[in-house]
Design a protein with these regions (language model features):
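Extracellular jelly-roll beta-sandwich "head" domains, especially the C-terminal globular C1q domain
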Residues: 2-6, 14-17, 28-174
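FIC/Doc superfamily catalytic core
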Residues: 11
């Protein structure tokens, strides 16, 4: 271990097989609580209006920390640092140009992070934005995702997709 790296292929007990017991005083880190949810049906949004995204289908929710039916928000049950992420797929229902889009992450009702794009040329009718951050959260904080889409004409839509419109978070083990 001259370079400070321990490389191990197999660990066995003193008899050469069996389970290894972790002794007292050892801290095991976990990335829970955690959740991920997605939008199961397209959500129509008013053109140019900041709208809460209603991620209504949970993929997993280890500690009942995500409300997928009323407030569409994440409220941690354990204080700590959390990795929080979201992706939104914006689209126009016609061949109308998307002018700009914004994805906002809110903490306790106020904007915490924002990602946006402005389209100046071309005929873009779909666009994906994502946001990731590490947040210090207590048990009464809550996090929500908002989207805003400006289009030339037609209907502004956040497209439903487990693979491209989702929201999740997990507690960092440290």
């Amino acid at each position: 271990m001259a370079d400070g790296i321990l490389k191990v292929g197999t660990i066995t007990n003193s008899a050469g097989s069996g389970n290894i017991t972790i002794g007292s005083g050892v801290t095991l880190l976990s990335n829970t609580p955690a959740f991920e949810a997605y939008l199961s049906a397209d959500q129509t949004v008013s053109d140019g209006v900041n709208t809460k995204i209603q991620f209504d289908t949970e993929i997993y929710d280890t500690n009942n920390i995500y409300d997928n039916s009323t407030n569409y928000r994440f409220t941690p049950t354990v204080a700590g640092k959390y990795f929080v992420y979201s992706v939104l797929l914006f689209k126009s229902d016609t061949a109308s140009q998307i002018d700009d889009t914004t994805l906002r992450l809110y903490k306790n009702g106020s904007q915490y992070k924002r990602v946006n794009t402005n389209i100046t040329t071309g005929n873009t009718t779909t666009l994906i934005l994502d946001v990731t951050t590490v947040m210090n959260l207590n048990t009464t904080d809550y996090v929500e995702i908002y989207g805003n889409l400006n289009i030339g004409s037609g209907t502004a839509i956040i497209e439903a997709s487990e693979k491209s419109t989702y929201f999740g978070a997990y507690k960092l083990g440290a």
